């Protein structure tokens, strides 16, 4: 059988028995039942508590930061891989102003493009015919091998030009694009300036006309007759030279009266 007092001591919290043996209850460590009146003990215990709190805080925060860093790194790696795979797929991006040449179809495409250009140039300028005539005059002509050699030489020259002058062509295209953009901006700015000048000149002319109308014509007392104020009426002269207004119904009778008045009177014998 176990001692009941020992069981009671194990069940009770630490420092329970020592709590009543200390005079100042406010300066007692309730966890360990120690007197806290000495400043050394207080400082040591406060430092321990701070260290424990800091360690707890760091242990709870650091894993979250590490998880965030891992997630962001994974996202960056995924985006980089996606970009590289996409660039390999379509192979049309320009890193640092240079054309990517990793495509397996580069040389076949260059050869086909060169053949098309050679035949187009030969059809337009008849290079093969001209060179054949020149070779025939110098007695080095063959109906089969000379045209083949001419086309092969032209093809090689075209390939070399496409390979070595591609960088200059891209640079020229970039420069022309920049020049066109700058010219477009200049033309747009000039158009805006011309439109602003036109609006300003129109406003000045309108203001000048309004000032002339208000200050000169009205101040001198002139009366402006508008087209609506003019009414057209049928007027006929009378026998004594006066004018009078007549309606359309009395025009015929007035003419008859005028004719009767102008007729000579018969002379009585």
Swiss-Prot record:
Belongs to the UPF0494 family. This is UPF0494 membrane protein C1348.01. The chain crosses the membrane at residues 107-127, 144-164, 177-197, 201-221. It is a multi-pass membrane protein. The keyword Transmembrane applies. The keyword Translocase does not apply. It holds the Pfam family DUF999. Its main location: membrane. It is found in: Vacuole membrane. Keywords: Membrane, Transmembrane, Transmembrane helix, Vacuole. One of its GO terms (cellular component) is vacuolar membrane. It comes from Schizosaccharomyces pombe (strain 972 / ATCC 24843). It comes from the Eukaryota.
